[in-house]
Design a protein with these regions (language model features):
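N-terminal, non-cleaved signal-anchor transmembrane helix
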Residues: 1-102, 106, 277-415, 422, ...
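Transmembrane-helix boundary motif in ABC transporter permease subunits
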Residues: 103-137, 412-446
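Generic hydrophobic transmembrane alpha-helix motif, especially the helices
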Residues: 137-171, 446-479
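Short helix-to-coil transition segments within interhelical loops
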Residues: 185-213, 239-241, 495-496, 502-512, ...
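Transmembrane alpha-helices
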Residues: 201-235, 257, 261, 510-545, ...
Length: 594
């Protein structure tokens, strides 16, 4: 029996209706568009149109790539065979780079925790403190790390301290924001229980809020460690020791065999770090998700426990004794307040000790010392005076023109990344391809692309296509595949399976299920990721100008070289205004489509 036979149509109304020949009104199947929705759609179309326009204005076409084919062959012949440094020198460079990256990540965590507590709604003492802390976080994220490196170089001079401060302060922009989000997502029940016992605000935060957010905090720190490792290549071009500085020296002397060998080492280092930290992050966040799901799924009764598997049933078991028996000589029973030394606790303590040892060794290798900090504190205010007030140095028109080129590079690179990341992300989603092996293969491809620093891609494209904006747009386009492809795959996998199963039940084919059920539900998240990628590409486009990839980054580096620090401040303010504009657009669009 069909659906129509099971539910016969209702009788028509008895009141006066339309005369013979009149058409029956159609029921709307889509919601009426709102003014906010139309405005957001118009803004997105303008962004896409801007990408197409930038693609054309920069003359990114097949002819440009074809003309560069001979340069690519010549460049490849000049890089082979690869010339790796001696083993001892290579290990020293790797350890120097890792020490700076680890120290910078720890510094960002130390700075981000109090900022996040001030920025989170449930822990902030007031609206003023929340607004100020949020502003500091946004400012740290908007200013490129190379600008912090230029300022830190004036304060601390040559050495690892410059890299630690530059990477650490810039990382606060991302780490602080994610930490604040993690604090806001904690369960208020534990904090309320502590408050009922008379605990103060600090005791509530240390006893209830931070323990819940700890897995997310560690996962975010590991993720930032990967990003800082890739960013360390950029700081080498402003004098920070490590693999990046050796790479910069090789590029300056046109020693492409040594340069590409160092680039391969940096790529493998980033890939290994991304793989290891990714596995740890998945384990930590999976435990948090399972715990939260178990708290929401079924209650806990006295004497019962939740099964460790999601969806398991509560099983009654006697609680272990918590009170030790009376001592032999007679006395008061002692309540045990610390957990027993199980294998899990021993393993966790071992990892904690190794982590602390790594942090201490990294701080020593980076050259961190109280005397360096004291000298930096003494020269901070004089150095700040070198950058203020902002000035144009007589090249204000050129700065505006190069800022426009930087925006074109970011738009074109984002469009290229979108075209490449959408199919790759779809193939990496298990619910789209249906084959775990195929999804795992494309996940690995995306991971390999993400492990390549954008600066290395820019160097390759500068040599192949020549100096200018074309190389920067191509580098950003290929580099965007790593982040945007992963975000697209994650968004597709997180869609609800119900609509897709309903279409499959009607006999729909794979592409019909994808375009009819999976992609529409993931599209709002994909749009948010796309705008975030545009934000990232705009800041990256500023950095790529350092190696001749066009844009305002070239003016930034030249101003720093000739000690025109007011011009550096002007460039930072111009880029900051553009970044804040795009970030505001992204926040508004996500709110409309939420």
């Amino acid at each position: 029996m069909s659906v129509a036979e099971q539910h016969p149509p209702a009788a028509p109304p008895t009141g006066p209706g339309p005369g013979p020949g009149a058409t029956r009104p159609h029921r709307r199947t889509l919601a009426r568009p709102t003014a906010a929705g139309l405005s957001a759609a118009t803004a997105l179309l303008l962004c896409v149109g801007g990408g197409v326009w930038a693609f054309s204005a920069l003359r990114l076409n097949i002819a440009t790539l074809t003309d560069s084919a001979d340069n690519a062959v010549n460049f490849l012949s000049r890089t082979l065979p690869l010339d790796f440094p001696p083993t001892g020198e290579l290990l020293s460079l790797i350890w120097q780079t890792l020490a700076i990256v680890v120290s910078a990540t720890v510094l960002s965590v130390v700075l981000s925790v109090p900022l996040a507590l001030l920025a989170a709604r449930n822990t902030s003492p007031g609206a003023g403190a929340r607004a100020v802390s949020r502003g500091v976080i946004v400012l740290c994220r908007a200013v490129p790390e190379v600008v912090f490196a230029i300022a830190a170089f004036r304060v601390f001079g040559l050495g690892g301290m410059t890299g630690v401060v530059a990477l650490g302060v810039h990382s606060v922009g991302m780490v602080g924001k994610l930490y604040a989000d993690a604090v806001e997502q904690t369960d208020e029940g534990q904090r309320t229980a502590l408050r009922a016992t008379g605990a103060g605000r600090l005791q509530q935060i240390t006893g209830a809020v931070l323990p819940q957010a700890l897995p997310s905090l560690v996962a975010t720190a590991l993720h930032r460690l990967d990003i800082n490792l890739r960013a360390s290549a950029v700081l080498g071009f402003v004098g920070v020791n490590g693999l990046g500085y050796a790479l910069s020296t090789a590029i300056t002397t046109l020693d492409y065999r040594r340069a590409m060998a160092l680039a391969v080492v940096l790529l493998l280092l980033c890939f290994v770090a991304e793989s290891v930290s990714g596995a740890i992050r998945r384990t930590l966040l999976q435990d948090v998700t399972t715990a939260r799901r178990s708290r929401r799924s079924w209650p806990v009764f006295p004497g019962a426990r939740r099964d460790e598997r999601p969806g398991g049933t509560a099983q009654a078991r006697p609680s272990p004794p918590t009170v030790a028996g009376p001592p032999a000589g007679g006395g008061t029973a002692v309540r045990r307040t610390l957990p027993r030394w199980s294998a899990r606790r021993i393993r966790g303590t071992t990892w904690l000790v190794l982590t602390v040892a790594l942090v201490v060794a990294s701080a020593v290798r980076s050259g961190l010392s109280w005397s360096t900090l004291r000298r930096g504190a003494e020269s901070f205010l004089p150095t700040l005076g070198d950058f203020l007030p902002p000035g144009t140095g007589g090249i204000g028109g050129q700065l505006l023109a190069d800022l426009w080129v930087t925006l074109q590079i970011a738009l074109a690179g984002t469009l290229i990344g979108l075209v490449l990341a959408l199919p790759l992300g779809a193939l990496a989603a298990r619910n789209v391809v249906g084959s775990p092996r195929a999804a795992r293969f494309f996940r690995t491809v995306i991971l390999l692309v993400r492990a390549v620093p954008e600066l290395v891609l820019a160097i390759v494209f500068v040599v192949v296509t020549g100096l200018g904006a074309v190389s920067g747009a191509l580098a950003l386009g290929v580099g965007s595949v790593g982040l945007l492809g992963k975000l697209v795959a994650d968004s597709l996998e997180e869609t609800e399976p119900g609509p897709a199963r309903a279409l499959v039940a009607t006999g729909a084919r794979g592409h019909q299920v994808f375009f009819g059920a999976v992609l529409p539900r993931a599209w709002p998240a994909v749009v948010g990721h796309l705008l975030y990628q545009l934000d990232v590409n705009l800041r990256s486009a500023t950095l790529l100008g350092i190696v001749g990839a066009g844009g305002i980054g070239y003016d930034l580096l030249n101003a720093a070289r000739v000690l025109q620090f007011p011009v550096v401040t002007t460039v930072v303010l111009m880029v900051l205004a553009l970044v804040l504009l795009i970030e505001g657009l992204a926040v508004w669009v996500r709110k409309v489509y939420a």
